[in-house]
């Protein structure tokens, strides 16, 4: 290993695609990005967290039990992160678990009588991704690049960073998903300036970004999207069709049956995926419910054309953001040389047709839409550590940022699609004589009036010296960092009085709450580790007892009675220990049995030695000698099994 390779091993930064439906983790290895498979052997992990009593399940185990535990299984939590309860009323209607609001009006989950925030759910998924990387790399991971939808606002980005902190990760950079995909696509492209569009339709959000790439520079020209549009909405369209059809045929409304709804939601997702490759699919859900006449079964045929009619409006909703992104970039469709398809929904033929109609060309299918974002995040991690050189990423802010001014008007300071990091300053004044303070209300959005945009923060600049209206010179500065997170300051130029804030997420997570959640996550990680160790000890003890009993039954005629009785007692001790929750007792009983089992091995070795001595009498010597001679002259015979055994044993000798 060279010095440079050794250095790249230190401070490795993983790339995480924290998706609505699935998440993925990748890392730079040997100068190339590598997607890491989970413990279950899959390259993506369902973004699902479930609670069963004191147990927390993440990923595939959580998804598997969702049908029987829908109220305590959180899916699509990304649609709620950094958002107020009033902003997610439409999403709440589509999930089986309880979404409520806390004291700040934030959307939170109520699980088993406790309040759990979307940030905590996201943190559990990030911990799973972190552990997946650690298991593969064999080293502790503390740093990550995490992707977010390009159209995520400031609150949602900050909440994602908070989730990373709760998971024990230092989030070195938040980057938009389309930008990450462009990095993955363009890293090995040697072509000079090339303009591309990244069409990213995932499980919960839609993004479109237009970029110019060339000579290692990835410059985002514009971005647009819809954070309320994704695969979940397509699933719900199929689900509603199934519910209506079943109600018409059977006269039974399944909407209040949460277990049936979860089964149908899973069936809808499966049918949607299948119809990307076939023209029709069967949906069969036996014993979905029952009435006085007996059990009812749901059997339906869904064709691709029917799916397209059910989801036509959803697919068409991708058109306007694409046209807006093109317009904002100053390009037309003929200037775009490639349209990169990202996100699972981009596999749908009807979606690909819309892409073709908008851009006048087929979408590029040379990247894996489920993995490309994580790959791009890993590349960005490589850029930050110096593993990837000569790459410059120039991103933009997706929404206009400004403040409220006289008359309830929003005055922009940073226009949308401004390259970041950036700083903008503007001078304002007071609206009344002798005004002692001003309230700076920070807004994000494209509307003209302040109340029509999203308020992402507010603060006061006090102790302004008395003076006529319009006289004080108040400088407001907006500073956006590379993560797209905003820092705001206001300064009275006459007195030098200044007030600064970093715009915190409107998730209501204060510093103390984040620290508490970090501690909670660490404690749960320790609990999970102990629980895993307990399961392993139990399995080992149970397996040993079984093997010991089998060996005892097999060799009971050759084992002295005293040893046989001792082993029987030890087996019984293990079985009794397994009936308890005392792990120390189980471990002790297992160790005792292991020691006792060695005696069987010793007895059998002696018996084998005596048997071999007896078998080498005058009558058998010639045969043995012949075999030995035969071995020497036929080294390479494939059926010479005895010789193979001897060679293996010899190889193991020091």
UniProtKB/Swiss-Prot annotation:
GO MF annotations, alphabetized: ATP binding; ATP-dependent protein folding chaperone; unfolded protein binding
Highest taxon of the lineage: Bacteria
Keywords: ATP-binding, Chaperone, Nucleotide-binding, Phosphoprotein, Stress response
Induction and repression of expression: By stress conditions e.g. heat shock.
Keyword Phosphoprotein: yes
PROSITE patterns recorded: HSP70_1, HSP70_2, HSP70_3
Region (Disordered): 592-654
UniProt-listed InterPro entries: ATPase_NBD, Chaperone_DnaK, Heat_shock_70_CS, HSP70_C_sf, HSP70_peptide-bd_sf, Hsp_70_fam
Keyword Secreted: no
Modified sites of kind Phosphothreonine: 205
Biased composition (Polar residues): 608-621
Low complexity bias (residue ranges): 622-636
Record-linked CDD domains: ASKHA_NBD_HSP70_DnaK-like
Role noted for this protein: Acts as a chaperone.
Stated family: Belongs to the heat shock protein 70 family.
Protein name: Chaperone protein DnaK
